[in-house]
Amino acid sequence: MFGTATRPGATRALLLGSGELGKEVAIELQRFGIEVIAADRYADAPAMQVAHKAHVLDMLDGAALRALVNEVKPDLIIPELEAIATDTLAALEQEGVKVVPNARATQLTMNREGIRRLAAETLGLPTSPYHFAQSKEEFVAAVDTIGLPCVVKPVMSSSGKGQSVLRDLAKLDESWTHAQEGGRAGRGKVIVEGFVPFEYEITLLTVRAVDGIHFCQPIGHRQEDGDYRESWQPQAMSEQALARSKEVAAKVVEALGGYGLFGVELFIKGDEVWFSEVSPRPHDTGMVTLISQDLSEFALHVRAILGLPVGTITQYGPSASAVVLREGHSQDIRYQGIGEALALVPGAQLRLFGKPEIAGRRRLGVALARAEDCPTAVEQAKAVAARVDVLF
């Protein structure tokens, strides 16, 4: 049973994280009459602009997070990013507050060490070789063990922050410092990963719901500086690789438990599959589903966390997304050329996130297109994204 938003019997959802992904989740929650309270570390975040109420706080501050939960009394808490006081979430869950998919999943996936040890050591899934390092001395030893080239990441970061590819020992200090500065919780442990000989990587959106586990068609994507630039669906791959990918994804989401959509990242070479990472929430590369499917990843996540059946997922054919990425400094971002951008590609769509400010490089929107094949859809989406003029 759901109540009506703003009424005494309202069903309330607290979004912890109010970026562009949270904004789409908020919209989908409101389709079921759910009252949405959006929280983030800064004011006027995208999801706050469509929520019933908004709160600004440091979500790594456990006392502040608990005070907010006590104030709004949510029926469910929906983590939408990694920088959260997960120990407090776990305690709240023990006290009867519903966290989706669950507090353990949020804890494990916030920290690369937790999810990597679960996948490789508990579930026995194939991954890249890895070592963790807490100190500079341990880092040097880990690089020596893994060998060059290797990938260095903070155990707590996202969107490529603090990540680097180390190819030369002369860059050892630089790589360590970059990882320390890029972690979400400040200085801390890093993971040193060996290269795997993959041909491409995919995101397999996997939904765990009351009516079982469901898979979206695989999503391919291109990354630059650790963050995605374009994504497309479906990614072409062998039947064996797809079947193996589903096996790996199902094992991971079953181990994490709870209901929701999980973005499972995998490396692929031929029929071989390696597990990379997982997020227990919608994935940025999955924004392509806003145009590629009848139920977007956000709609699927909301159905699952509300305990509703997913049913059948219909994919419309080759589709792509391309980000509107700009660099500058402003607290009054304006856009022009939107009509011209949409006119470039009949049927194309554009989402501007409404981010209140920019300081450096930031993702401000996404262009979406469908075509006869994925490469064409990618080029069309890129053309639409490039035509948008951003004024600072």
Swiss-Prot record:
Annotated metabolic or biological route of this protein: Purine metabolism; IMP biosynthesis via de novo pathway; N(2)-formyl-N(1)-(5-phospho-D-ribosyl)glycinamide from N(1)-(5-phospho-D-ribosyl)glycinamide (formate route): step 1/1
Matches recorded under Gene3D superfamilies: 3.40.50.20, ATP-grasp fold, A domain, ATP-grasp fold, B domain
Protein name: Formate-dependent phosphoribosylglycinamide formyltransferase
Any GO molecular function: phosphoribosylglycinamide formyltransferase 2 activity
UniProt entry keywords in alphabetical sequence: ATP-binding, Ligase, Magnesium, Metal-binding, Nucleotide-binding, Purine biosynthesis
Organism name: Aeromonas hydrophila subsp. hydrophila (strain ATCC 7966 / DSM 30187 / BCRC 13018 / CCUG 14551 / JCM 1027 / KCTC 2358 / NCIMB 9240 / NCTC 8049)
Top-level taxon: Bacteria
Primary enzyme class: ligase
Gene: purT
Residues that coordinate or bind ATP: R112, K153, S158, S159, G160, K161, G162, Q163, E193, G194, F195, V196, E201
Catalysis performed (reactions): N(1)-(5-phospho-beta-D-ribosyl)glycinamide + formate + ATP = N(2)-formyl-N(1)-(5-phospho-beta-D-ribosyl)glycinamide + ADP + phosphate + H(+)
The enzyme's E.C. designation: 6.3.1.21
Family: Belongs to the PurK/PurT family.
